[in-house]
């Protein structure tokens, strides 16, 4: 699909695992902490390397992969002297720390880790550069734990839950955020979780939450991102093919990516957006 849109595409293959070191935390609910810590390090290095002269698209996996992608991209942004912004499209903010997560599922911590929240030192890889929480926009939230709500407010993350989208519409909320990115000449990473979408159109995810983005809302987000010319990297995460219905969730994720990368019904004036992916 991307090739048909005129983009040069190279499959970089799977990230290679690195040795796992023993890590023990007082929160005994944490699942696979040593393994995810090791994968975070490996993915971070891969993201840093892949973002040198191209727009990387990272395929998960659950959302824990974004602890690695975002931290690696933040390091790249710091090396180029530009700020990294993150658009987090998700039913959940994934803003737990290792201490606050009751489930122990580490796909609930990546945004807290990548933004430099406390409690990860000694357990996750050190952060060469953290994302400024005020440059993070979460959109589509509809399942937020009390500890996450407090942390989001204290950190200053931009939060647009589904009520805000219902009240104001998704376009003006996204337009305001993109204006901030543009004003600071920032790099923009988009992290798209399948559960951002309503489960009626995207059932292939293990963490479905009713009331998500509609088909047209999701495509509008991608079309606006494409028009902006600001996106520098992309996560596609949480797709579970075993839960899909004749591949319709996978097809939708491909179509959304195509909208982000320039597929449109009619031509519109946009900023130049071309290169290798």
Task: Give a label for each model feature.
Residues 88-91, 115, 140-143, 161-163, ...:
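Short, structured patches in soluble enzyme cores that scaffold and shape functional sites
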Residues 91, 107-110, 132, 148, ...:
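Internal, well-ordered alpha-helical segments in soluble enzyme and binding-protein domains
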Residues 125-126, 142-160:
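Active-site-proximal loop/helix segment associated with metal-binding centers of metalloenzymes
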Residues 100, 116-119, 132, 202, ...:
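Short capping/connector residues at structural and topological boundaries
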Residues 133-135, 142-148, 184-188:
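Aromatic-lined glycan-binding groove of carbohydrate-active enzymes
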Residues 55-126, 135, 228:
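Active-site histidine-anchored catalytic micro-motif
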Residues 1-58, 65-69, 75-79, 151-277:
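Catalytic cores of soluble, metal-dependent hydrolases
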Residues 96, 144-146, 241-243:
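Active-site environment of divalent metal-dependent phosphoester hydrolases
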């Amino acid at each position: 699909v991307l090739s048909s849109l005129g983009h040069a595409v190279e499959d970089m293959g799977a990230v290679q695992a690195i040795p796992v070191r023993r890590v023990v935390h007082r929160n005994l609910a944490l699942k696979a902490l040593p393994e995810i810590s090791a994968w975070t390090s490996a993915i971070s290095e891969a993201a840093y390397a892949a973002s040198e002269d191209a727009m990387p698209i990272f395929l998960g996996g659950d959302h824990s992969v974004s602890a690695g992608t975002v931290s690696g991209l933040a390091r790249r942004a710091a090396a180029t002297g530009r700020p990294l912004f993150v658009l987090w499209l998700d039913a959940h903010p994934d803003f737990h720390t290792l201490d606050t997560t009751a489930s122990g599922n580490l796909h609930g911590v990546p945004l807290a880790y990548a933004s430099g929240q406390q409690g990860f030192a000694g357990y996750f890889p050190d952060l060469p550069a953290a994302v400024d929480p005020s440059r993070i926009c979460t959109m589509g939230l509809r399942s937020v734990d009390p500890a996450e709500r407090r942390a989001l407010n204290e950190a200053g993350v931009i939060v647009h839950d589904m009520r805000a989208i219902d009240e104001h519409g998704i376009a003006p909320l996204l337009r305001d955020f993109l204006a901030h990115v543009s004003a600071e000449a920032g790099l923009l990473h988009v992290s798209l979780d399948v559960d951002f979408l309503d489960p009626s159109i995207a059932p292939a995810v293990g963490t479905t939450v009713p009331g998500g983005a509609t088909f047209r809302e999701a495509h509008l987000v991608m079309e606006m991102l494409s028009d902006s010319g600001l996106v520098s990297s992309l996560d596609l995460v949480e797709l579970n093919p075993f839960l899909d219905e004749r591949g319709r969730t996978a097809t939708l994720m491909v179509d959304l990516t195509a909208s982000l990368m320039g597929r449109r019904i009619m031509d519109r004036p946009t900023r130049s957006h071309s290169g290798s992916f």
